[in-house]
Amino acid sequence: MFAKGKGSAVPSDGQAREKLALYVYEYLLHVGAQKSAQTFLSEIRWEKNITLGEPPGFLHSWWCVFWDLYCAAPERRDTCEHSSEAKAFHDYSAAAAPSPVLGNIPPNDGMPGGPIPPGFFQGPPGSQPSPHAQPPPHNPSSMMGPHSQPFMSPRYAGGPRPPIRMGNQPPGGVPGTQPLLPNSMDPTRQQGHPNMGGSMQRMNPPRGMGPMGPGPQNYGSGMRPPPNSLGPAMPGINMGPGAGRPWPNPNSANSIPYSSSSPGTYVGPPGGGGPPGTPIMPSPADSTNSSDNIYTMINPVPPGGSRSNFPMGPGSDGPMGGMGGMEPHHMNGSLGSGDIDGLPKNSPNNISGISNPPGTPRDDGELGGNFLHSFQNDNYSPSMTMSV
């Protein structure tokens, strides 16, 4: 009779009723109740052929096994007779390792009382597919906002470059800051490599400012500016946090990354943010750190402390008095004091002597006088400020 339902994994209710009726009839015959067996078949209107199994029959055998296990349960084993096999079955089941889903539920107790918690058989939270499938966050930058940048400071040379921002968009990680130079001085508008020589166009300075000298110095990543390159002629600049990047050198056709020219035109980076040809003071279209590009070179960071914004304006100690106590590594960035020794300094404008090798300490007197060496226009006013 079971052959009729081979196609279904679980027998239907009709098949279960037929099997139970067959086992009842078989049991009645094996116990000697033949009249009762025939009456049973006639009352249920059984019309199919019946094949009897071996005595005592399936129903009797099944009942004996069930009853033995039922009596050997821990709560009934002291009052009911049971076999040692049934007792061992319960003891083994209780001592077995708990299931990761059902825990220590005894075999005869089934599911615990009370409502089943949500997701009981669905694995840990979040494992179910969402009706609106979303890709996994395999790109870390996708979790950092629409204008994200790699989590690496521009002080580290060769690090990932932040994305370009447009127009008046605020910087991604520094709220409330503004660019240090207007768009007219943005060197990124005129792309090119320092080695291209005269093919680069000349940058236009902002109004009220003279030309930036015959040869803006071209420092590679990690290079330091000469000692006299920080002068008293930028009185109102509030330097924001961060590190700057070098200007391209439109007048230099050599491939040496350190070509020292007029010492008054560069406020250099302490580690460079990238290859030569990127701006020292980017406009809003450059990096998200536009207002914090030349800060760590000037503002020493105390150990364990935070930076403090201080103006580079004149003070009681002179135009750049606050710079006197600088340590050499703040002008250095990631390279040591001897990293650029021996490199040629072959710009024709190298006319002002450098009293100290790059990266060595100096006093306040060395910081004055030469910053606007090549500023030929007197229209520059000390009241012109570039505030953060």
Curated annotation (Swiss-Prot):
Residues annotated as domain LisH: 16-48
Amino acid composition bias (Gly residues), ranges on this chain: 315-325
GO molecular function, a single term: transcription coactivator activity
Keyword Nucleus: yes
Composition-biased stretches (Pro residues): 126-139, 272-282
Annotated PROSITE patterns: LISH
SMART domains: LisH
Residues in coiled coil: none
Phosphoserine modification, residue list: 347, 352, 355, 381, 387
InterPro entries linked: LisH, SSDP_DNA-bd
Keyword match Transcription regulation: yes
Start-end of Low complexity biased regions: 200-209, 250-268, 346-357
Modified residues (N-acetylmethionine): 1
Phosphothreonine found at: 360
Gene Ontology BP terms: cell differentiation; head development; head morphogenesis; hematopoietic progenitor cell differentiation; mesendoderm development; midbrain-hindbrain boundary initiation; positive regulation of anterior head development; positive regulation of cell population proliferation
Modified residues (Asymmetric dimethylarginine): 155, 161, 165
Intracellular or extracellular location(s): Nucleus
Entry GO terms, CC: nucleus; protein-containing complex; transcription regulator complex
UniProt function note: May be involved in transcription regulation of the alpha 2(I) collagen gene where it binds to the single-stranded polypyrimidine sequences in the promoter region.
Protein's recorded name: Single-stranded DNA-binding protein 3
